[in-house]
Amino acid sequence: MSQSKPLVFAMVAGELSGDILGAGLVKALKARHPDARFVGIGGPRMEALGFESLFAMEELAVMGIVEVLSRLPRLLKVRSSLVSQLLALKPDCFIGIDAPDFNIGVELKLKQQGIKTVHYVSPSVWAWRPKRIFKIAKATNMVLSLLPFEKAFYDQHQVPCTFVGHTLADDIPLELSKADARETLGLDRDAEYLAILPGSRGGELKMLSEPFIKAAVAIKEALPDVRFITPLVNEKRREQFLTALETHAPGLEIQLFDGQSREIMAASDGILLASGTATLEAMLVKRPMVVAYRVAPLTYSIASRMMLIKRYSLPNLLSGKDLVPELIQADCTPQKIASEVVAMMNRDNRALIAEFTEMHQNLRQNASERAADAVDVLIGANAPHGRSSNEVG
């Protein structure tokens, strides 16, 4: 169809991983629709591409049931204001990127007013609260899933879903040089490094900094030559981690970096990290890992009763096997973490890396382009270079 005015795409990304996905999609849609406007809530990567943020992304980056409750009045105010502004703007499509507890409510209100809605990143309906799929069906015209097993779940319930793969799998080479990463970061070419990634959100660092730092002390005793490297997403998180380091192990040396998490992972011999998207990135970088996580006790008590899965990290979920150790909640102790990390650093991990490589190949689908294809088809926009917008995939 011919556009009489530039397209408007509204998007909301709730945290760092959503900003990465959003930036890829903005770039792909911009290539097709150079005059399009992109507006909503995004992070620095999206904003660097000309995205207009109506609120700071940090407002949405909260975790856990208890933590969300304390911020609920502000979150509801942000959502209400955002919906009002978007209804006035009447975008051609709204794309909620992850953050389902925030975005699905937005999608529902917009869809009821005739605006096309897409949810990019399936909520973990296969893991817990499966009945959410009915609300998702009511709120969205299309779900874009990153993982192959998710589409089958949606197909069972006749909810429109497109498997697009994961942008991280597209962006990260099948082989990433450890030596090159060390040179980039100015690290010793021959030393042994453990990357420590306690998360990107304030709530994660609050829960994980202490056990990770205390574990590092024990790891250093068992492996005296090991060195620690930690990327932190911004100055707030750096200050938060430094405070924890001074409190729990003032004499421990950990080299801190601003961002550069992928380079840090690639430079390492092994990784200790919080559960979440970072576990996928660690898998794609092909480094062995130990995954640990804990939340507020009440949050865990409520959530664990609703869980349908026994595995939490993406390498284990994708493989259907216990490929990497997971230390969740009561198991997330300095002693258990240190024990698993020392074992990981001492073992031959070649078979594990081969499994990671196979999973990487399966997730490589040119995700941003496939997502942009699906959005174009949904809104009936012309595909670029004379290609029919029906030729998706």
From Swiss-Prot:
Reaction(s) catalysed (UniProt annotation): a lipid X + a UDP-2-N,3-O-bis[(3R)-3-hydroxyacyl]-alpha-D-glucosamine = a lipid A disaccharide + UDP + H(+)
CC terms in the record's Gene Ontology section: membrane
Record CDD domains: Glycosyltransferase_GTB-type
Pathway: Bacterial outer membrane biogenesis; LPS lipid A biosynthesis
Known EC number: 2.4.1.182
SUPFAM superfamilies: UDP-Glycosyltransferase/glycogen phosphorylase
Keyword Glycosyltransferase: yes
Intrachain disulfide bonds: none
Keywords on record: Glycosyltransferase, Lipid A biosynthesis, Lipid biosynthesis, Lipid metabolism, Transferase
EC top class named in words: transferase
Residues in the signal sequence: none
GO molecular function, one term: lipid-A-disaccharide synthase activity
InterPro entries registered for this protein in UniProt: Glyco_trans_19 (IPR003835)
Record keyword Lipid metabolism present: yes
GO biological process: lipid A biosynthetic process
Family, per entry: Belongs to the LpxB family.
Annotated function: Condensation of UDP-2,3-diacylglucosamine and 2,3-diacylglucosamine-1-phosphate to form lipid A disaccharide, a precursor of lipid A, a phosphorylated glycolipid that anchors the lipopolysaccharide to the outer membrane of the cell.
UniProt protein name: Lipid-A-disaccharide synthase
Lineage of producing organism: Bacteria, Pseudomonadati, Pseudomonadota, Gammaproteobacteria, Alteromonadales
